[in-house]
Amino acid sequence: MKAVIQRVSEARVEVDGSTVGAIGRGILVLLGVEKGDTERDAAWLAEKMAGLRIFEDDAGKMNLSVREVEGSILAVSQFTLAGNCAKGRRPSFDTAAPPDEGKRLYDRFVDLIRETGIPTATGIFQADMKVHLVNDGPVTFILDTKSRSSST
């Protein structure tokens, strides 16, 4: 799984002109599921999202998690994160999980986040979505479950 995470002061996702998910302060997660990803990847990523200290404390250091600042998470599926632009001019999506598997693991990731008690909003899987955000910082990170160490 690949995730682009952004610390936001607010974010929302629209489908057909209607807001389907919105948060205030928190994390926007753009999530791409690849072939070979498992529930273990979803669990690792959900745990990482809940505990990642990317919010500033009183001293101005990134030392607080989304839970500690009583923030929320907006999770948006984005299969294009599995795209490969190394050859030619058009991306290849050969490594993207099939839609049914991608949806199953995306839904599992969302369920695991919700189980932590962090308020979580979502987009709609496979919909044409418009994502609006105010990136706070800006603070943006890229996580790939394939590059995690065995100790995390």
Curated annotation (Swiss-Prot):
It is an enzyme of class 3 (hydrolase). A motif (Gly-cisPro motif, important for rejection of L-amino acids) lies at residues 137-138. It comes from Geobacter sulfurreducens (strain ATCC 51573 / DSM 12127 / PCA). InterPro entries: Daa-tRNA_deacyls_DTD, DTD-like_sf. This is D-aminoacyl-tRNA deacylase. An aminoacyl-tRNA editing enzyme that deacylates mischarged D-aminoacyl-tRNAs. Also deacylates mischarged glycyl-tRNA(Ala), protecting cells against glycine mischarging by AlaRS. Acts via tRNA-based rather than protein-based catalysis; rejects L-amino acids rather than detecting D-amino acids in the active site. By recycling D-aminoacyl-tRNA to D-amino acids and free tRNA molecules, this enzyme counteracts the toxicity associated with the formation of D-aminoacyl-tRNA entities in vivo and helps enforce protein L-homochirality. Its EC number is 3.1.1.96. The gene is dtd. It is found in: Cytoplasm. One of its GO terms (molecular function) is D-tyrosyl-tRNA(Tyr) deacylase activity. Homodimer. Belongs to the DTD family. It holds the Pfam family Tyr_Deacylase.
